[in-house]
Amino acid sequence: MASITSNSQILINNDSSTNKAPTTNERQLRRINHPPNLRIVPPLNFCPVENQLYRSGQPSIINQSFLNQLNLKTIIWLSSEEPTDEFLEYCNDSSINIEYLGMINEFNSEPATATTTDKQSQSQSQSQSEEQKSQSQSQSQENQHHQFEQSDNNLLQDPSHLISSTIAKINNNNPWDSLNENTIKHALDLIVDKTNYPILICCGMGRHRTGTVIGCLRRLQHWNLNSVSEEYRRFTGSRGGRILVELLIESFNIDLVNINWELAPDWLK
């Protein structure tokens, strides 16, 4: 009888050992082998700036799940390229207002609110003029880029002309150059109004144009200029920052920004 009891106890012990809870390593392996169906991909160079204020490169379709988590109300679009139809449709379905500031210049000082209807009407009205100007624009863009890089080197050798050269370059209407003062003012007017929040500020790569607006915002927050430059260069990659961008940030007149302190975000007060 004793041997039968001991054998039954062995069988019971074996059964209990096979039904024990999985170890930590087993749980980790199970998570790796079975990833969730929902994949969240942030836009390039995404980073929080302040509470409910974000910056990034130009969002695409694969970033929609991530953007849904932000509950955005406004997107400040600084890129010279217009948003795609798919992205406009997503923003329309999500009730996100796109402020298209990428092409503001001295002749067109008003921002555009991008919608699918607006984009279709613009493409129809501009199709003929774009065909006529496409050849001349493609030739001039290369020359402008070369002059832009050459001017940066000249500024290093002759610091006495820094500010004057900066203003002359900023006022150029070439969309490949840095933003002008008008664009920055419009962007900051939107940022200092908490009724527009949450806000995403974006441009093509989330580097120079976005960095210019953020740098001027930091000046509005009375940051030290060294800290402003360090934050700007953090997003520029291996090529480093542009001298003209940093000079524009330094010379921007923050008194141009219209601040209603009753509607200003708490972090600005």
Swiss-Prot record:
Pfam families: Y_phosphatase2 (PF03162)
Compositional bias ranges of the Low complexity kind: 120-142
Gene3D superfamilies in the record: Protein tyrosine phosphatase superfamily
Catalytic activity: O-phospho-L-tyrosyl-[protein] + H2O = L-tyrosyl-[protein] + phosphate
EC top class named in words: hydrolase
InterPro entries, per database record: Prot-tyrosine_phosphatase-like, Siw14-like, TYR_PHOSPHATASE_DUAL_dom
PROSITE patterns the record matches: TYR_PHOSPHATASE_DUAL
Molecular function terms from GO: phosphatase activity; protein tyrosine phosphatase activity
Keyword Disulfide bond: no
Subcellular location: Cytoplasm
Alphabetical GO biological process terms: cellular response to oxidative stress
Top-rank lineage group of the source organism: Eukaryota
EC number per UniProt: 3.1.3.48
Domain named Tyrosine-protein phosphatase: residues: 45-261
Main localization, broad class: cytoplasm
Active site: 203
Region feature (Disordered): 1-25, 112-151
Keywords: Cytoplasm, Hydrolase, Protein phosphatase, Stress response
A GO term from the CC aspect: cytoplasm
Record function comment: Putative tyrosine-protein phosphatase required for protection against superoxide stress.
Protein family (similarity comment): Belongs to the protein-tyrosine phosphatase family.
Protein name: Putative tyrosine-protein phosphatase OCA1
Species in which this protein is naturally found: Candida albicans (strain SC5314 / ATCC MYA-2876)
Lineage of producing organism: Eukaryota, Fungi, Dikarya, Ascomycota, Saccharomycotina
